[in-house]
Every structure is written in structure tokens, then in C-alpha cells.
């Protein structure tokens, strides 16, 4: 499942990334979801969402006309005053429908408060047993748990960075990286230590944390 949120989005990157995802999941059609102003991405690219969710208060006039023209799209109109964002509402909806792997585009560029809120959706997904990731043309952001293997030939970009997802991370070990760690207690205050690392081994690099702790992988 791919949710397109209302933040800034590089359309050429997004279209290429969607093609890549569909190729990797050739036996199953991607479910495409427009979260509020993310609807404009579909209007501008000619793609048709399977689901449109939001109060649509920030959608352009052209986007609202496009919304009215959709005949094969399930539309969930929300009240402007609510207890979550349109992106979180869309995420909860597709999880309730059975989605187990969700990518969110348009979630990193624009308002910083929305970006920080979208980072929290990674933890929300983990709590519900669902993998959630955010992506743009420069970043792929997900949670990393103990024992995660990162393959050099599959990595998104040149660099790999780690940040605590919540409180301090105890016992962080990085093997096979340019800058290794052994049993390090990583806090937000010193997370600059784990910025712009590089996978050194050709095959695989390892992360190890104590049980039930996670870090953000960018």
C-alpha cells in the first residue's frame, strides 16, 4: 500500500519509485491512497487512487473538481476538526483493511510539524505489527530492530544514519559499517555520532540492540 500525503513531492521520483515497487510486487497490484492534498499528485500525474481520505480543505480547486470526477475511487470525507491528521487517518484505515506494508510519499517536505508527526507513524505501525516507511528523492526512513541486516547492493542512497526512536537506545552495535559501534548507549543529544555512516562490507551489515528497542534508519 502506498499513501501519498500532502507535503512537497518530486513527481518524477515518485512515479519511478512506484514503478519499481510494482515491479517488485508484480503478483499484486499496489493499493494507492490519496491523503488530502496528496490528491493533487494523482490529478497531476494521471494516476487514479483506489482510496481518497481527508477533509480536503487544503486541496486545490482543480483537485476538488478531480475528486468529484472519480468514479472508481472510494472516498472518505472527514471533518476538519479531528484528533489526527489526514495522513494518520489514511494509515489507520488501510491497516484496518489488512495492509501490512505501507510506504508514505509526500510526508517529509513542507511543514516541520507534519513531518515530525509523520515520523511518529512509524512507531504507530510497529505497535500494530505493520511496517511503515517514509520516502522522498533523498531519504528512505524506517524503524530498525535488533538483528536487522542492511545490504549494500539494496541500500537507498550512499549514507545510512541512525537516530533513537523515542528514548535512549541501549547497546547499539553496528558491524560492517565504516564507523562501527559496540554496545553504545545512543541518546538524542549525541545522535550526531550516527549520522552519515556507510556500509563497508559488500554483502551485509548488522545492527544489534537490546530487546524491544528501535532506531530510525535514514
At which residue positions do the language-model features occur?
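N-terminal beta-strand-loop-alpha-helix module at the start
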Residues: 1-66
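General beta-strand structural signal in soluble alpha/beta enzymes
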Residues: 4, 33-36, 54, 76-77, ...
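Short Gly/Thr/Asp-enriched flexible loops that form oxyanion-binding sites at enzyme active sites
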Residues: 113-123
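Class I SAM-dependent methyltransferase SAM-binding "motif I" and its flanking Rossmann-like core
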Residues: 123-155
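A charged, well-structured terminal subsegment
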Residues: 160-180
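A conserved acidic, glycine/proline-rich C-terminal tail/linker
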Residues: 176-201
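Conserved small/polar residues in nucleotide/adenosyl-binding loops
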Residues: 207-214
Amino acid at each position: 500500500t502506498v499513501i501519498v500525503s500532502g507535503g512537497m513531492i518530486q513527481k518524477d521520483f515518485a512515479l519511478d519509485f512506484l514503478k519499481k515497487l510494482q515491479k517488485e510486487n508484480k503478483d499484486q497490484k499496489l493499493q494507492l491512497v490519496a491523503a488530502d492534498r496528496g490528491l493533487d499528485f494523482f490529478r497531476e500525474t494521471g494516476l487514479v487512487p483506489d482510496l481518497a481520505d481527508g477533509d480536503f480543505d487544503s486541496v486545490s480547486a482543480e483537485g476538488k473538481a478531480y475528486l468529484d470526477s472519480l468514479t472508481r475511487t472510494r472516498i472518505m470525507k472527514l471533518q476538519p476538526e479531528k484528533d489526527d491528521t489526514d495522513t494518520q487517518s489514511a494509515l489507520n484505515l488501510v491497516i484496518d483493511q489488512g495492509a501490512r506494508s505501507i510506504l508514505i510519499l509526500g510526508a517529509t517536505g513542507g511543514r516541520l510539524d507534519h513531518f515530525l508527526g509523520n515520523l511518529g507513524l512509524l512507531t504507530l505501525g510497529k505497535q500494530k505489527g505493520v511496517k511503515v516507511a517514509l520516502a522522498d528523492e533523498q531519504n528512505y526512513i524506517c524503524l530498525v530492530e535488533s538483528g536487522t541486516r542492511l545490504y549494500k547492493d539494496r541500500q537507498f542512497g550512499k549514507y545510512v544514519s541512525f537516530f533513537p526512536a523515542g528514548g535512549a537506545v541501549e547497546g547499539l552495535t553496528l558491524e560492517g559499517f565504516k564507523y562501527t559501534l559496540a554496545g553504545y548507549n545512543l541518546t538524542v543529544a549525541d545522535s550526531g555520532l550516527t549520522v552519515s555512516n556507510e556500509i563497508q562490507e559488500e554483502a551485509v551489515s548488522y545492527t544489534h540492540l537490546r530487546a524491544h528497542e528501535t532506531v530510525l534508519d535514514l
